[in-house]
Design a protein with these regions (language model features):
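Outer-membrane beta-barrel proteins and related beta-barrel translocases across Gram-negative bacteria
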Residues: 1-189
Length: 189
């Protein structure tokens, strides 16, 4: 984890080319130890900086010429013994030349893996036709915005965010007809 916040002053106060900026860079790399919390993961790869940081505060030529940076923070959770899982992440792509940001915050996916809702807990006799019906579920939520660095927390940017929600519920079954033909109807909702 590293945070740098240089105060930049170019030229003399009162001159037409005078510039004063407070720049910063946040750099963070993290990966959770899988043994720390079984069933969940957390990782972060953050390199977030103001657009003037590379121009006025870079410590190497490569850093000064770098125009694109990106950051991602991710979390996922699986509930052991259940069909449920959740993943969430956020990402930011920056262009220091134009001072623009592309933000995806949050992206969330909730899954329910394949299960048989009509299957009896204790099978007695022959399997019924409806016990072969399986279901899955996937729900996705995405939210994104593009804005200038100086406008990112404005009311207008928040109002212009693009967001969407998507459901996927496949229902299927497989039946054996005359011991030679497999019939597998599927419905997607």
């Amino acid at each position: 984890l590293s945070f740098t916040s240089p105060n930049v002053r170019v030229g003399d106060k009162g001159e037409p080319d005078f510039l004063q900026q407070n720049n910063f860079q946040l750099y963070w790399q993290h990966t959770q130890d899988p043994k720390a919390n079984p069933g969940s993961t957390f990782s972060a790869s953050v390199d977030f900086r103001t657009s003037g940081y590379n121009r006025y505060s870079a410590t190497s030529l490569n850093e000064a010429l770098q125009t694109q940076t990106s950051s991602t923070i991710s979390y996922s959770k699986s509930w052991l013994g259940t069909p449920f899982s959740l993943s969430a992440n956020m990402s930011v792509s920056q262009n220091s030349q134009s001072g623009t940001l592309s933000i995806a915050l949050p992206n969330v996916v909730f899954n329910v893996s394949t299960f048989y809702p009509f299957k009896r807990k204790e099978a007695m006799g022959k399997q019924r036709w409806y016990e072969k019906i399986s279901l899955r579920y996937t729900g996705k939520f995405n939210n994104k915005a593009n804005a200038k660095e100086s406008e990112i927390f404005t009311k207008e940017t928040l109002q212009n965010m693009q967001y969407g929600f998507e459901h996927s519920i496949p229902i299927s079954a497989t039946y054996n007809i005359f011991n030679y033909i497999n019939f597998g109807p599927t419905i997607n909702y």
